């Protein structure tokens, strides 16, 4: 009997794959536990429609990430902070500060977890930050910290 897996099944296959199993295994284990459905023409069409929709969604997300990366190119994030005489900050600047700046100044909503800073920014100066927007798509930002 051919079935379509609804979840990954160890030793059998990945989610949404079409596999051939014995009738008893399908009727007594896979289908009752909700791990698979019988591979009828309607179910195969539903599976293909879902795969197509997922593919379109990923393409759309990739296009949006590339567009956002273009917008981020050339942006210099200038943050003001209180610092001591030797240029050492009272505290430090984080990816949240960079994210807040981009939201306020450029109306770009970027999650702070996507911004990776090379080192902790604890003194005045210029730093390079990388924004990971999508697997394989990232943008570089220049972060300047100036005396308040």
Curated annotation (Swiss-Prot):
- Which NCBIfam families does UniProt cross-reference here? L9
What are the GO BP annotations of this UniProt entry? Answer: translation
Family per record: Belongs to the bacterial ribosomal protein bL9 family.
**Per its record, how is this protein called by name?**
Large ribosomal subunit protein bL9
Q: Matching InterPro entries, A to Z? A: Ribosomal_bL9, Ribosomal_bL9/RNase_H1_N, Ribosomal_bL9_bac/chp, Ribosomal_bL9_C, Ribosomal_bL9_C_sf, Ribosomal_bL9_N, Ribosomal_bL9_N_sf
SUPFAM superfamilies xref list: L9 N-domain-like, Ribosomal protein L9 C-domain
Q: Which GO terms describe its molecular function?
A: rRNA binding; structural constituent of ribosome
> Which gene codes for it?
rplI
Q: Which UniProt keywords apply?
A: Ribonucleoprotein, Ribosomal protein, RNA-binding, rRNA-binding
Function according to Swiss-Prot or TrEMBL: Binds to the 23S rRNA.
Cellular component aspect of the GO annotation: ribonucleoprotein complex; ribosome
Pfam families noted in UniProt: Ribosomal_L9_C, Ribosomal_L9_N
The superkingdom listed in its UniProt entry is Bacteria
